């Protein structure tokens, strides 16, 4: 819906996700682990906005480690159909092969008009790295 600056100026959003973000002086910085429909997702957050989801807006994930949207409600990001909004930075797609495969599938389906299943890929090294990150961050 909107972004409200630290000075109180309201800037309209695109209307895709039902979220309102308030700019803050304090930053939320650090590694994040989320529980999502795509499995655990790891990343890094560095933001000063505090985002609140609208009543019917689904979050991208639930915070297992980190601050998330606002440091208090346990949500991170927002998802509507094939749109994901998130504060996560870093190598999000290589670090989360299941999420990457899902996004590739969505894009291919939108491009071709039919469901597309990614071919068999050897994601073993990526899966091991992902599991190591999740385990380390939740320890």
Predicted segments with their positions:
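Short, glycine- and charge-enriched coil/turn segments that flank and shape catalytic ligand pockets
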Residues: 5-9, 37-40, 66-74, 109-117
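Hydrophobic/aromatic beta-strand patches that form the interior of the parallel beta-sheet core
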Residues: 15, 44, 84-86
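Acyltransferase
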Residues: 79-139
């Amino acid at each position: 819906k909107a972004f409200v600056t630290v000075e109180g100026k309201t800037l309209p959003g695109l209307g895709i996700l039902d979220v309102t973000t308030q700019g803050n002086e304090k930053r939320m910085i650090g590694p994040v682990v989320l529980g999502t429909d795509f499995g655990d997702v790891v990343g890094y957050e560095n933001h000063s906005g505090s985002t609140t989801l609208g009543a019917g807006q689904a979050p991208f994930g639930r915070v297992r480690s980190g601050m998330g949207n606002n440091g208090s409600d346990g949500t991170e990001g927002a998802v509507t159909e094939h749109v994901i909004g998130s504060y996560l930075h870093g190598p999000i797609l290589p670090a989360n092969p299941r999420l990457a495969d899902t996004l590739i599938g969505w894009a291919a389906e939108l491009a071709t008009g039919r469901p597309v299943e990614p071919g068999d890929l050897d994601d073993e090294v990526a899966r091991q790295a992902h599991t190591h990150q999740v385990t380390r961050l939740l320890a």
